[in-house]
UniProtKB/Swiss-Prot annotation:
It comes from Arabidopsis thaliana. The keyword Transport does not apply. Keywords: Membrane, Peroxisome, Transmembrane, Transmembrane helix. One of its GO terms (cellular component) is peroxisome. This is Protein APEM9. Involved in peroxisome biogenesis and matrix protein import. Required for pollen maturation and in vivo germination via its role in peroxisomal function, which partially involves jasmonic acid biosynthesis. Transported to peroxisomes via the interaction with PEX19-1. Required for peroxisomal protein import by acting as an anchoring protein for the AAA ATPase complex, which consists of PEX1 and PEX6.
Amino acid sequence: MEATDIWGEIERSESYLVCSMYEEAESLSSSILKRIFGNIDVLSDEASQGDHQFHDMLESAGMVLVQSLHGIGRTVEIVNELRDVFGEVAAIPVQVLLTGVCLQISNGSYLGVRDILEEFFRIWVYKDNHYILNDAGVSTKGFHAKNCLDIDEYMEVVELYTFGVLAKFSNDMGLAISWVEKAALPEERRQGILRRLHSLLSLKTASSFEENSKDSSYAVVNNKKSLGNEKNDEIDSFLKLSKQHEPWSLWSSHPLSLKVGNTQFSMSRGKVAVSLVGLIICYALKRKRAALIRIIRRQMESTRKAIVDFWKLAFSYQVNPLAAIQSIPSTTT
């Protein structure tokens, strides 16, 4: 029971993968695939469901292979490993191809990706609303794989190629649009992809225009800054020259020197100015002092005189001490 044994091995490789035993899973899945391709005729005769079960074996073992390669850090080798193990691109199940390519692209590696996808498109032909293998380009090994694809499976590969490789990696939206327009695709699906590509192109164009506008704005600002700096330099130079030709000022920071005999005194002009102002104020106050004293004396004298007059007036008023007990004389009628 060759098929039963292979399924048991596939389940064991899946267990390794679940347990994160990636090296064991990779080794066993690769061995299973080689064993399958070494016994194609026997498996085709023993499989109760024919090629359908054969395809399921390839798909299950292939999924373990690509995920285990990713787990052990060999993601960049996935496409090349698929070619080596399966031999023919036609023999690689679509889901295995998609998963492997996506894992490799997500790791930032496009090594062999474009070549394997373009070879995939060459061997599948659109006919009667589905895709079939082009027998002229497929060997006996590939012919035993699934030889018919529905539209949804094929379109998944188309979208990965147009958006993930041409539009993103090659950064050529025009090439992606041109390829879709010429590819053998159902018209409704073609128009859907073209609309998405044109939308992306519009967004990219708008983004580029915005970046160019920002660059232009930055250039204008930088030019203005440079002009401003030049003007500031000119102003600084002018100020320096004006300081050099500045007339003598009492408030200047340069010190004044005075030599008396063998002794030399040095004092800043600011201190000299403050001292002169102080002397002027003292002189003015001294001259005003006598006048101020006279004014104050006159005011004090007038105040004292007013107080004395008030008291004299108060005590000069005669009061009769018997007025309180004398009766008021009555009038006669």
